[in-house]
């Protein structure tokens, strides 16, 4: 497989136009995701500094639960919407968004009940209302954000995301300086900023009255489109969330806090991983219509190459100066400064995660969700097999096990993609395509 070049036989002015479009879309999605990740990183650093290890570990577990529920919303709402918008006339977008919003509200209600019940069952009834409020407000912010990004409006999403995520970092800083920061107050403060960001997003969207008669058929269609995405993202989350929960069981929530502290450094690559990953499904879906899986991959790899240099530069920095990165993030007297080796392992793992995740996103965009699920399932198998490393090595074992799982997923994803491209470009496939009536 070769990287580079625009889709099809584009040349000259068409190639230049395609390149400008790619750069514009990729740039704004990276800027938007950069704002989100910067705010999230500052928030996590502040909470790691000022909360007890036990409370910060609890916060990390809560975040994991939110991501699991967010995957349901993304797969059954945001991903199908991004596919549908490509084929819907612009004059009908408001009607589509109105009906989609109604489905999203109903789904959020169900998930919020599960969030409340889960918090109580885990023995933290004291923060059940706070976690549920935070989850619902996050749902509102993230769903409206996805409404914008589904139409490639990443530039329009920046202000709402800045309000939410940079606002959270600011308000947590104020609470910490006033000695009023607790896990509960942090969750309520985060909720308030998510609602403010959602309001900004809504101001940039147009909604028509929902067509309630069409909502059930629409949800069925969304479910058909999103079921493989749901399975895919849940196994991805299972692969990553398996380790903090296992650490909490075998070593306590303080070990989970150390894991999260190391992961926060690697997560600085998330603006690229999540940003490029946001735009690839839509780009691959559009290119597949005329170019098949080959066209989808050609479209996707341009975005992958766009994000690869900063991934490699950051990975090299962390490998060369892990202690400096930890000290810069958590201060010179932080209990997390002994996590250097863990940070190095996770940095390498996240670089591999970038490529593997983008291949999986390409498969989803090309409506090959079954193969995307199979690809990610291999990572879960690798995680389960490597999980016992936690017992002798603790947090270090968790980092090694996750790196092994990510590497297995990457290898399998590359093999799947190579097989698909070879199959589509084989002489037999080309002859069959030539015989199809036009």
Q: Model features per residue range: what roles?
A:
Residues 3, 18-75, 227-254, 315, ...:
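Signature of the first transmembrane helix
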Residues 5-22, 129, 155-160, 181-189, ...:
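Interhelical loop/hinge segments that connect adjacent transmembrane helices in multipass membrane
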Residues 24-37, 62, 66-119, 126, ...:
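Membrane-water interface segments that mark the loop-to-transmembrane alpha-helix transition
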Residues 24-41, 157, 163-164, 168, ...:
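Transmembrane helical elements of multi-pass membrane transporters/channels
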Residues 102-231, 348, 355-361, 373-378, ...:
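Hydrophobic transmembrane helix module of multi-pass membrane transport proteins
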Residues 118-131, 320-351, 396:
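Interfacial segments at transmembrane-helix termini and the short loops linking adjacent helices
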Residues 184-198, 377, 381-382, 396-414:
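Small-residue-rich transmembrane alpha-helices that serve as helix-helix interface/gating elements
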Residues 40, 73-90, 262, 266-292, ...:
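Helix-loop junctions and terminal segments of transmembrane helices
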């Amino acid at each position: 497989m070769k990287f580079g070049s625009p889709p099809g036989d584009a040349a000259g002015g068409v190639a230049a136009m395609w390149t400008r479009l790619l750069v514009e879309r990729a740039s704004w999605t990276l800027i938007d995701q950069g704002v989100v990740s910067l705010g999230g990183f500052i928030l996590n650093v502040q909470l790691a500094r000022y909360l007890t290890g036990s409370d910060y570990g609890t916060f990390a577990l809560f975040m994991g639960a939110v991501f699991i529920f967010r995957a349901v919303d993304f797969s059954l709402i945001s991903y199908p919407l991004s596919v549908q918008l490509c084929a819907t006339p612009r004059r009908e977008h408001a009607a589509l968004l109105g009906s989609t919003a109604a489905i999203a509200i109903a789904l959020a209600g169900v998930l919020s009940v599960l969030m409340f019940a889960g918090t109580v069952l885990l023995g933290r009834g004291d923060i059940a209302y706070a976690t549920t409020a935070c989850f619902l407000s996050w749902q509102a912010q993230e769903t409206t954000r996805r409404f914008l990004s589904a139409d490639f409006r990443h530039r329009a999403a920046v202000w709402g995301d800045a309000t939410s995520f940079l606002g959270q970092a600011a308000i947590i800083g104020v609470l910490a300086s006033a000695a009023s920061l607790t896990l509960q107050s942090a969750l309520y403060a985060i909720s308030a900023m998510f609602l403010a960001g959602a309001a900004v997003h809504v101001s940039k969207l147009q909604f028509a009255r929902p067509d309630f008669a069409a909502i059930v058929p629409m949800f069925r269609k969304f479910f058909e489109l999103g079921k493989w995405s749901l399975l895919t993202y849940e196994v991805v989350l299972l692969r990553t969330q398996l380790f903090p929960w296992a650490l909490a069981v075998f070593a306590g929530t303080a070990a989970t806090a150390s894991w999260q502290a190391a992961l926060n450094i690697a997560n600085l690559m998330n603006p690229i991983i999540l940003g490029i990953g946001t735009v690839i499904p839509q780009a691959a879906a559009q290119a597949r219509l005329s170019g098949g899986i080959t066209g989808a991959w050609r479209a996707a790899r341009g975005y992958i190459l766009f994000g690869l240099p900063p991934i490699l530069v950051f990975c090299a920095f962390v490998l060369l100066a892990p202690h400096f990165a930890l000290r810069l993030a958590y201060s010179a007297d932080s209990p997390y400064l002994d996590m250097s080796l863990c940070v190095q392992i996770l940095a390498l793992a996240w670089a591999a995660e970038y490529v593997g995740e983008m291949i999986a996103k390409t498969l989803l965009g090309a409506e090959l969700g079954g193969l995307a699920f199979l690809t990610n399932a291999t990572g879960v198998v690798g995680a389960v097999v490597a999980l016992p490393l936690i017992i002798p090595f603790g947090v270090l074992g968790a980092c090694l096990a996750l790196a092994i799982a990510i590497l297995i997923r990457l290898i399998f994803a590359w093999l799947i993609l190579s097989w698909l491209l070879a199959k589509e470009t084989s002489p037999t496939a080309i002859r069959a395509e030539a015989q199809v009536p036009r």
